[in-house]
Amino acid sequence: MDSSNPYFQQARRTSVVKSLIIITVASWLAVQAGIQLLQVDISQYLALYNYNSEKFRPWQLFTYMFMHDLSGFMHIFFNMLGLWMFGSVLERHWGSKRFLTYYLITGMGAGVISMLAMTWQLNPMFESVQAYLANPGYVQFERFVSDNMPGSYQNDQLNQFLKNWYYNQQNPEYVRESVRAVMEISDMRLNTATVGASGSIFGLLIAFGMLFPNAMIMLLIPPIPMRAKYFVIIFGAIELFSGLRNNIDDNVGHFAHLGGMLVGFILLMIWKRRDNNRSGYQPFEELP
């Protein structure tokens, strides 16, 4: 997106946006340093786990927003870019207090919806686990792995196990090993953590689209201009489609994104109704 757009030229980096960027980047660097220097990964206490996981703690609904993917820079980079581009405009429009309230509520709301969606997505796997425990076997195990284990986790050791079992299907030891593997796969999926400020960023995105629907946004790929309201609709539709696909190889929290948009929309409607009762205040207006 093109920051030379006149709407964004007015978006000075304000205090809350600046502070959030500093805190988020510092948190990401601190986690990296802890792993590299102390062999301690504090993100396992701060990332958001499903409420059915033994690793879940209530404070994670707040702290997960400041954790990001450690395997690369792009996750945190694009989130902070979105925070700066959209957040700066919104903080100027709302003021720091309302902006921070909105950012945190949409982020935590996105976390709640993400956990609920994850439970829905995992239910078929839990049913498959029970079915396998009741009737274990080579064919059933192969199907379970294909349906429930992300491709990135399927390695040579697993393939060798399947190959050996194929030629020794009467050996009960393979059944016992497969049961342990099924439970490990189930635990791995259940204990997958959610990290990132994306829920809040998508909340900012819908707020920008509703407050300034006719603002022109220049996309990077493809490089075409688009009104904010259409940009939000397209992004929301893509996230909904991707989330409903429930692809186990997709490592993106689509329902966290949708959750941020939904909570943001509800909060905007509440504020609009309340603010309409205040004389002279127009919560939905164009930037000058």
Residue ranges with predicted function:
Residues 1-288:
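A detector for small-residue-rich transmembrane helices and their helix-helix packing motifs
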